[in-house]
């Protein structure tokens, strides 16, 4: 816990100020199934993994590349070297995800597709944490630039994918610092999972 606090106070990575929040939400969920889509160095893996150990959950971290700094090598953790869309396509539909952290490829079509899959894999007690709705130093404002037509931020990026969700079924709020950490929740649909 001390290392998470130190990174949250003194860290200069683009998600360091969210590490305690990620840990607290995963811990409070008391869920059993955590997934992390996008790993890079493994900075956000650490709070998810530490919470998973404490509540007896399992964390699946998914990325095309191996983590460069933090990768647990014991129980409660599985690293999957795969595209996140393929991973979600293969996830058992009857296995509810309690906590999902989404921070990999940020293009609008990619994030929209992730959310379409997650819609079937989460229930009303699940949370989806999304990083970078305020990327590029736009915080505390959402990054709504539609001028990127190619690459990672194409077509409106993650903000557009979230902003287009039907508010009748979804609610969300964003912590407005360090590129934003959005907390997304499916309100009441029990079409796939009751809790």
Show which residues each predicted segment covers:
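A short alpha-helical cap/connector motif
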Residues: 1-101, 105-195
């Amino acid at each position: 816990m001390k290392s998470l606090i130190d990174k949250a106070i003194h860290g200069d990575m683009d998600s360091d100020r969210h590490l305690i929040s990620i840990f607290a939400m995963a811990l409070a969920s008391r869920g059993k199934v955590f997934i992390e889509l996008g790993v890079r160095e493994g900075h956000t893996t650490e709070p998810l993994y530490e919470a998973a150990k404490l509540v007896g959950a399992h964390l699946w971290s998914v990325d095309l590349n191996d983590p460069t700094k933090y990768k647990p090598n014991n129980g409660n953790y599985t690293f999957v070297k795969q595209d996140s869309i393929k991973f979600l396509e293969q996830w058992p539909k009857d296995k509810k995800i309690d906590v999902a952290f989404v921070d990999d490829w940020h293009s609008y079509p990619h994030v929209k597709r992730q959310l379409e899959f997650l819609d079937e894999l989460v229930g009303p007690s699940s949370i989806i944490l999304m990083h970078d709705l305020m990327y590029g130093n736009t915080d505390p404002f959402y990054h709504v630039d539609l001028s990127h037509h190619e690459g990672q931020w194409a077509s409106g990026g993650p903000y557009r994918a979230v902003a287009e969700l039907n508010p009748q079924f979804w609610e969300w709020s964003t912590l407005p610092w360090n590129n934003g950490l959005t907390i997304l929740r499916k309100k009441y649909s029990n079409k796939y999972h009751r809790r």
